[in-house]
Amino acid sequence: MSWLTPEVIDVIIAVVKALVILFVVVGCGAFMSFGERRLLGLFQNRYGPNRVGWGGSLQLVADMIKMFFKEDWIPPFTDRVIFTLAPMIAFTSLLLAMAIVPVTSTWMGADLNIGLLFFLMMAGLAVYAVLFAGWSSNNKYSLLGAMRASAQTLSYEVFLGLSLMGVVAQAGSFNMVDIVNSQAHLWNVIPQFLGFLTFCIAGVAVCHRHPFDQPEAEQELADGYHIEYAGMKFGLFFVGEYVGIVTVSALIVTLFFGGWQGPWLPPVIWFALKTAFFMMMFILIRAALPRPRYDQVMSFGWKVCLPLTLLNLLATAAVILYTAQ
């Protein structure tokens, strides 16, 4: 066929990759939302959702149908364009970051030489969804949530990036495949344990998950920045949160736990098992930890996490210089 040129084939492959990433990541996030509700019920000694389907297995479908048929109402006092744009950014920002995560040595959306920088850019973009939602809603609780999000992001984005610089220094590259290959003999979690801890903390904060969910604290801000959202717009915020958890969990596996590497089992299975473990850790953190005060969250970021990150970076630089001599 004359129209099937190499350029057209490249476009078709890119579209197929994008659709696969979309359906797989959103499907994992949807499964996690159901698993979270069941596990929280187990942790809190209650049943959890168990009415729709066998063992509550169709509860997610029922929730999606309910959300789909709810009125897509936009308050008259909002900025309609920004109000509509905010949930789209929340859904797509960390979903795009998943494109740079290699599932195996050949399965990935995009093999970028600046892959890690692309993730940091998308993580910084995600906060604009919260800012747009809080500002455009013209609601004092939404605006307070947006202000909290901007200040919290300013604090935690600093050591989110610095916690990864030790990994980059050891691998000598921002490319995700190169970082995984550099862990063939020793996973980065051992020499970069402080970087691993601070990246996990910053990852929870980037996803606005408990205990760093101050921008949407129900007891203080009545659900915060998405108080005026309903229907599918609220659904995009909801799904975007779980997409962020999947992306951060996959990045933890790639950067610190050898990615797809492991004995006996196929690489895809190893990657899926490791990622699922850290997704479950997000749920356990929500069940086990209380929500601290907002000033305590900010102090913890600047006074504890940032010094630990700088200490890890200095130690990594010293080791690299010593071994190079």
Curated annotation (Swiss-Prot):
Keyword Cell inner membrane annotated: yes
EC number, UniProt record: 7.1.1.-
GO BP field: aerobic respiration
Main subcellular localisation: membrane
MF annotations from Gene Ontology: NADH dehydrogenase activity; oxidoreductase activity, acting on NAD(P)H, quinone or similar compound as acceptor; quinone binding
Stored Pfam families: NADHdh
Gene Ontology terms: cellular component: plasma membrane
Keyword NAD: yes
Transmembrane regions: 11-31, 81-101, 114-134, 154-174, 186-206, 237-257, 265-285, 304-324
UniProtKB keywords: Cell inner membrane, Cell membrane, Membrane, NAD, Quinone, Translocase, Transmembrane, Transmembrane helix, Ubiquinone
InterPro entries, per database record: NADH_UbQ_OxRdtase_su1/FPO (IPR001694), NADH_UbQ_OxRdtase_su1_CS (IPR018086)
Source taxon at top rank: Bacteria
Membrane topology: Multi-pass membrane protein
Location within or outside the cell: Cell inner membrane
Catalytic reactions on record: a quinone + NADH + 5 H(+)(in) = a quinol + NAD(+) + 4 H(+)(out)
Family of the protein in this entry: Belongs to the complex I subunit 1 family.
Quaternary structure and partners: NDH-1 is composed of 13 different subunits. Subunits NuoA, H, J, K, L, M, N constitute the membrane sector of the complex.
Physiological role: NDH-1 shuttles electrons from NADH, via FMN and iron-sulfur (Fe-S) centers, to quinones in the respiratory chain. The immediate electron acceptor for the enzyme in this species is believed to be ubiquinone. Couples the redox reaction to proton translocation (for every two electrons transferred, four hydrogen ions are translocated across the cytoplasmic membrane), and thus conserves the redox energy in a proton gradient. This subunit may bind ubiquinone.
Annotated protein name in UniProt: NADH-quinone oxidoreductase subunit H
